[in-house]
Regions:
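A short, internal acetyl-CoA/4′-phosphopantetheine-binding micro-motif in the GNAT/acyltransferase core
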Residues: 79-89, 117
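Conserved GNAT acetyl-CoA-binding A-motif
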Residues: 105-117
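Conserved active-site alpha-helix within GNAT-family acetyltransferase domains
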Residues: 95, 107, 119-137
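Acetyl-CoA-dependent GNAT
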Residues: 11-12, 19-74, 80, 144
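Conserved acetyl-CoA-binding loop-helix of GNAT-fold acetyltransferases
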Residues: 84, 90-103, 130
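Terminal substrate-recognition subdomain of acyl/acetyltransferases
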Residues: 129-154
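A short beta-loop-alpha structural element at the N-terminal edge
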Residues: 3-17
Length: 154
C-alpha cells in the first residue's frame, strides 16, 4: 500500500473518524456515539485502535479490545469496528489494519479474535472471511424491551 501509514489511534483523530463513519453510514445521528466510543476505547487499558493515514489524512480506522474470560471463552481479542473511507476501499487498507490489530493481540498472548457482523452485510462477511474468520459457537440474540413491565410469578 504505497503512501499508507498505519499508526496508533489518537483523540485528535476523532473528527476524521466521524467523517469516515458518516461517509459510510450516511447517518449523522451516530456521530455522538462514534465519538464517545472512540474516547471510551482510548481510556480503556485493554482497548486499542489504529488508523491508516494517506498524505496526513485518516482514511481508515480499526478498534479492538482484549476482553477477559467469560461466556466460556478464554481471554480473547475483539475486533469492535473497522471502517475505510469509501474512496479508499478495495486497496487493502482494512486488511492491513486488521493484520496490525492481530499482531497486537498475538504479542499479548491472545489466540482467538472475535467480531460480530450483520448477517446480510455480504461485503463485510467477505472481508472477514478473507482475514480467516469463520462462524463461532455463539449466535447473537436480541430482545426488544418496550414500555410494558415483565412480570414473573414466584
Amino acid at each position: 500500500m504505497p503512501g499508507i501509514k498505519l499508526r496508533k489511534l489518537r483523540a485528535k483523530d476523532i473528527p476524521q473518524i466521524i467523517a469516515i463513519h458518516g461517509a459510510i453510514t450516511k447517518k449523522k445521528a451516530y456521530h455522538r456515539w462514534i465519538q464517545q466510543m472512540v474516547k471510551d476505547h482510548l481510556r480503556k487499558q485493554e482497548g486499542v485502535g489504529f488508523v491508516a493515514e494517506k498524505e496526513g489524512q485518516v482514511v481508515g480506522f480499526i478498534i479492538g479490545e482484549i476482553k477477559g474470560e467469560g461466556f466460556g471463552l478464554e481471554k480473547s481479542g475483539w475486533l469492535e469496528v473497522v471502517m475505510v473511507h469509501p474512496r479508499h476501499m478495495g486497496m487493502g487498507i482494512g486488511y492491513a489494519m486488521a493484520c496490525k490489530l492481530f499482531d497486537y493481540f498475538r504479542r499479548r498472548g491472545i489466540r482467538d479474535v472475535h467480531t460480530s457482523v450483520l448477517w446480510d452485510a455480504v461485503d463485510m462477511l467477505s472481508f472477514f472471511k478473507s482475514l480467516g474468520f469463520d462462524r463461532s459457537t455463539f449466535i447473537n440474540l436480541i430482545k426488544h424491551v418496550d414500555q410494558k413491565s415483565i412480570h414473573f410469578s414466584s
